Structure formats: structure tokens, C-alpha cells
UniProtKB/Swiss-Prot annotation:
Its EC number is 6.3.4.2. Keywords: ATP-binding, Glutamine amidotransferase, Ligase, Nucleotide-binding, Pyrimidine biosynthesis. Catalyzes the ATP-dependent amination of UTP to CTP with either L-glutamine or ammonia as the source of nitrogen. This is CTP synthase. One of its GO terms (molecular function) is identical protein binding. InterPro entries: Class_I_gatase-like, CTP_synthase, CTP_synthase_N, GATASE, GATase1_CTP_Synthase, P-loop_NTPase. Belongs to the CTP synthase family. The keyword Ligase applies. It catalyses: UTP + L-glutamine + ATP + H2O = CTP + L-glutamate + ADP + phosphate + 2 H(+). Pfam families: CTP_synth_N, GATase. It comes from Neurospora crassa (strain ATCC 24698 / 74-OR23-1A / CBS 708.71 / DSM 1257 / FGSC 987). PROSITE patterns: GATASE_TYPE_1. One of its GO terms (biological process) is pyrimidine nucleobase biosynthetic process.
Length: 579
């Protein structure tokens, strides 16, 4: 097993996740099998109960693991399916060590950070790195490890020590450290001191950077590169200038251009890894497709409005943004995403701040498509309901995801079924017409890990042959998508809702839980209880999102026809081979 560690200094949030993902993609183009691990030093066991405004999106994996959003980047770039164990947190490690101590596994010894916590971290990395993550079912060749936060943080120290020991145990040519640092510009001059101090700090902690990736807004000057190389004891060709790019999908192209793949091959002796001609050819095909679908830019745009609750922090909807971008690229357009706070569409804002109210409604009215994503709680939902009503009545393409589907159902119940007080049990537990109810298997007391999580099957129902969404899935009868919710459509209202024109075309295994809703006589009005954004890939966009964006552009029929004709485009495959 070969390891690529991506660490960071100076400040967090400089793009370690994108650089780690890009590195993995480049290795994959050689035909190697690549997996990834994200280390988060926080004490939370997982990201399931974290506030999206503080931490960003909670990404859901196929096994129901609620993790850091960077694991979404890994899956999107590498085309793999990771599991909850691929996200290591301080909380998980200490929980494991304490449980082992309670079971007597340490035979009465004093349990300490060194060696017990350190060994637990190393053992977890070694175990998880060998778990197959693609359909080949084979052990990965390379594991990308991203160390979250910045080296030097108190909470990071056990992980730094563990990674230092892991490097020694892995042996020569089996471990490489890429250190990511920020190069600020002050009065027009690129400053290297922060990078010098960061590298000095990481060296003193025991990790020796082999490559230094300098994040910068503009290309680094040669003098700056030379200064970083000499002060950080690396060669000039081991300094990567990772400047801001028009899209993050061009970062792999930039890194390949700067010779990252050459350095990885040389340091890790990747030419010694035995690969079948089929794997090599497959890797080359992935790279060719990536280069084709990620051009410098598109002349035309598509205007999409996102009506959400957490619009102040765009990372709260990261996977939604990426799914829209993937779909726009597939349709040959650039995404112009317009953010609308759902509260600004409500009557309260009309009275208190008419300017915000009219601005929000102007954006909704002129948009080519309206998206209502997931969320929790009552705040802002009346604005979402009004946006869903506008999309339905004005024939504007609409996609509702999770909560977005639920507000579409509430809107139809109120305005088509004339149940004026229709609402969700989440918003009003005592309302007469609760068309959305709490799932019986959930828990209102224990929030962490108690939702309906992970990959579940959805079955398209007889009579759904008219469905635009079903056609986008290649006329499949059963699909698998990831879920994260506590509430569902009340079965008592299904008949009345369907009589009004809201057709529930997809249901779960029992046939009692509603998963997909669609309006027949509409350009594209779809609601899904699952989260299709979690499985969207750069080379294989999510079907609900692809249909939504294509309908907004006016090319839905063309895209659907191409999907039905191109078997290789379906199910994340190239010529039938999973990548």
C-alpha cells in the first residue's frame, strides 16, 4: 500500500480537499485503484449533528455515514463509494480506545495517548486503506490521506504523531507528504514567510514535506518559487503553484501541467506497480473524458435559483452546487446560480423589508429553473412553499430535494386539494392536516445517527411510464439513491393528492413510503425524498439534477435521447466498465 498525505499550514480552508481529490484523480488516470481517508481532529463522532452554517454540508455516504464534505469531493473526482470509516475523527478514535479499555483489551495497563491512541489511529488507517471502494472488488493501490485543520493545532498532534510513525512503518517509496500552504499578496508582493514558518512547524512535529503546494490567487513568480524551495529544503520542481482557476475541475489539469504526476511516479515508484492493460486503458479513457468535459469555459449560461435556508454559507449546499455544475457542463452551459433566502419570499419580509422581498421575488420570477434543497425546521418554509407554487403555476422547471419535495406536497395540498392548513408535523405537531409526518422508526430525543440514512431502493410504479425522470434513469424500474430524513409523506393523503395531479411515481420496498413525485403536464416538476446530489459525479451527473438543468435550458428531450442511446453513459460507466 502506498500513501499520499495532504497536510496544511498557515490557515485552514485553502483547498486541501480539492488538491487531495485532484491528486487521486491523476493517480487513477494511470490505472491505479485509489481510495481516500479524511482525518478531522474535532471531538465530534461525526458531522451528523453539526450546524451547516458553522461546518458546511454534512455529506452522506452509501452506508449512511454522516461525514465531512471533503469526502464528497473524493467521491466526485474518483468515482468511488466510500464508507463511514473513511472519515476518522478524534471522537471516533477516543470512543474506540475507551470501549477497548472497558472491555479489558489493554490487560490492565494505563491507557495513554502514546501508544494506545496513536496505535488506534494507525491501525484504522491500515485497515480502511485496504477496503475495496469500486466495483472491481480489489484492494486499492494508493490511499490519499487528508489531515484536516492545520498542523500545529493542539487537537491535531496525536494524528501528526501517528502519521509520522506510519511513514516510518510504510517504508521508503511508499509514503509522500504534500504540504499545502497559502501565499498571500501584500502591497503587490507575494509573501513566503507564512509558508516558511508553516513548513518549519510541520518539520518540528516530525512530518517532512516532499512537495509544497502553494495556494495563491495569481501565478507564483519564479523568484517566489525559488525562495520557497530554498527555505523549505525542497527542489524547485517540488514547489507547485496552485493558483485560483475558473473552476475547481481544472485543478487536476493544472497540477498535471506542473509535473505532480511525474513527482508521484518517481517518489512512490509507481512504475513498479503491476497493472493490467485494461486498467491502464480505462485510466486513459477517464483522463480523456475529463479533459473533454472540463474546458476553459462556456459562452452561454443557465440561470438557476436556489431557494434555501442556509444561503449565507454556500458550503451548506456544496453537493447541490456540484450536481448543478456537473449537469450544466453536460449540457454545454455555465451555471449561474442565484441565491434566494426563503424567508425573503414571505409576507413578514414584505412588511419589514420590502426591498429584500421584491428583490427575492424578482430573482424567482426571471429564473429558468427553481430548486428547493433539503433542510430542517420551520424557519423559511413558507417562502419555499410559495416558490413551489410559482414554479407549478408558471410552468417553470422545478426540483425539490428532501424538504423541497415535502414543501411541494404541502403546497399542492393547500392550493390543489384545498386543505388550507396543510403542513408538516415538523412545523406543527397539532395541525389537523399533517400531510408530512414523523417516521415511526426515528427518534426525536437522540438526534445523531437516528435518521433514515444511506442507500435505499426506490421502485418506479406501474403507470409511471410518462415520467420524465424515469426516462432519465434509462427507463429503469428500480434505482438506488442516498437518503437523510426523519419525515415522510402521510399515506392517508396520497389518493387525494394524486387526484389533484401530483403523482407519486416512486416508492420504497414496502410500497408505502413515497420517494418520488412528479406532475405530468409540466415541463419538469419533480420532487425526490432522497438526496441525488450525493451520487452526482463530474463524468456522470445526477439524473434528477441533469433533467432539471436540461429542462431549464430547453434541451431535456435531447439529453434524454442521448442517455437512452448511450448505454456507456449510464450507471457511472465507460463502455460498460465502472470507473
Amino acid at each position: 500500500m502506498k500513501f499520499v498525505l495532504v497536510s496544511g499550514g498557515v490557515v485552514s480552508g485553502v483547498g486541501k480537499g480539492i488538491i487531495a481529490s485532484s491528486c487521486g484523480l491523476l493517480l487513477k488516470t494511470l490505472g491505479l485503484k485509489v481510495t481516500a481517508i479524511k482525518i478531522d481532529p474535532y471531538i465530534n463522532v461525526d458531522a451528523g449533528t453539526m450546524n451547516p452554517k458553522e461546518h458546511g454540508e454534512c455529506f452522506v455516504l452509501h452506508d449512511g455515514g454522516e461525514t465531512d464534505l471533503d469526502l464528497g469531493n473524493y467521491e466526485r473526482y474518483l468515482g468511488v463509494d466510500l464508507a463511514r470509516d473513511n472519515n476518522i475523527t478524534t471522537g471516533k478514535v477516543y470512543q474506540q480506545v475507551i470501549e477497548n479499555e472497558r472491555k479489558g483489551k489493554y490487560l490492565g495497563r494505563t491507557v495513554q495517548v502514546v501508544p494506545h491512541v496513536i496505535d488506534a489511529i494507525i491501525d484504522t488507517i491500515n485497515r480502511v486503506s485496504r477496503v475495496p471502494v469500486d466495483k472491481s472488488g480489489e484492494e486499492p493501490d494508493v490511499c490519499i490521506i487528508e489531515l484536516g485543520g492545520t498542523v500545529g493545532d493542539i487537537e491535531s498532534m496525536p494524528f501528526v504523531e501517528a502519521l509520522t510513525q506510519l511513514r516510518h512503518r510504510a517504508g521508503k517509496n511508499n509514503f509522500i507528504n504534500i504540504h499545502v500552504s497559502y501565499v498571500p499578496v501584500v502591497n503587490g508582493e507575494q509573501k513566503t514567510k507564512p509558508t516558511q514558518h508553516a513548513v518549519k512547524s510541520v518539520r518540528s512535529a516530525g512530518l517532512i514535506p516532499d512537495l509544497i503546494a502553494c495556494r495563491c490567487e495569481k501565478p507564483l513568480e519564479q523568484g517566489t518559487i525559488n525562495k520557497v524551495a530554498s527555505s523549505c529544503q525542497v527542489e524547485v520542481n517540488q514547489v507547485l503553484a496552485v493558483r485560483d482557476m475558473p473552476t475547481i475541475y481544472q485543478v487536476p489539469l493544472l497540477l498535471e501541467e506542473q509535473g505532480l504526476l511525474r513527482e508521484l511516479k518517481e517518489t512512490l515508484k509507481l512504475d513498479d506497480v503491476k497493472l493490467s492493460p485494461a486498467r491502464v486503458s480505462q485510466g486513459q479513457e477517464v483522463w480523456a473524458k475529463w479533459q473533454k468535459i472540463v474546458p476553459l469555459g462556456y459562452a452561454e449560461t443557465v440561470d438557476i435559483v436556489l431557494v434555501g435556508k442556509y444561503v449565507e454559507l454556500h458550503d451548506a449546499y456544496l453537493s447541490v452546487i456540484k450536481a448543478l455544475e456537473h449537469s450544466a457542463m453536460r449540457c454545454g452551459r455555465k451555471l449561474n446560480l442565484i441565491w434566494v433566502d426563503s424567508e425573503h419570499l414571505e409576507e413578514k419580509t414584505q412588511k419589514e423589508d420590502p426591498t429584500k422581498y421584491h428583490k427575492a421575488w424578482h430573482d424567482v420570477c426571471v429564473a429558468k429553473g427553481i430548486l428547493v434543497p433539503g433542510g430542517f425546521g420551520h424557519r423559511g418554509t413558507e417562502g419555499m412553499i410559495r416558490a413551489a407554487q410559482w414554479a407549478r403555476e408558471q410552468k417553470t422547471p422545478f426540483l425539490g430535494v428532501c424538504l423541497g419535495m415535502q414543501v411541494a406536497v404541502i403546497e399542492a395540498a393547500r392550493n390543489l386539494c384545498e386543505l388550507k392548513d396543510a403542513t408538516s408535523e415538523e412545523f406543527d405537531a397539532n395541525a389537523e392536516h399533517r400531510v408530512i409526518i414523523f417516521m415511526p422508526e426515528g427518534s426525536k430525543e437522540k438526534l445523531g445517527g437516528t435518521m433514515r440514512l444511506g442507500t435505499r431502493s426506490t421502485h418506479f410504479q406501474p403507470g409511471s411510464e410518462f415520467s420524465k425522470l424515469r426516462a432519465l434513469y434509462g427507463e429503469a424500474t428500480t434505482i438506488e439513491e442516498r437518503h437523510r430524513h426523519r419525515y415522510e409523506v402521510n399515506p392517508d393523503y396520497i389518493e387525494k393528492l394524486e387526484q389533484s395531479g401530483l403523482i407519486f411515481i416512486g416508492k420504497d420496498d414496502s410500497g408505502e413510503r413515497m420517494e418520488v413525485v412528479e406532475i405530468k403536464d409540466h415541463p419538469y416538476y419533480v420532487g425526490v425524498q432522497y438526496h441525488p446530489e450525493y451520487t452526482s459525479r463530474v463524468l456522470d451527473p445526477s439524473r434528477p439534477f441533469l433533467g432539471f438543468v436540461a429542462a431549464a435550458i430547453g434541451c431535456l428531450d435531447q439529453i434524454t435521447k442521448e442517455i437512452l442511446q448511450d448505454a456507456g453513459f449510464a450507471n457511472g460507466s465507460i463502455n460498460g466498465a465502472h470507473f
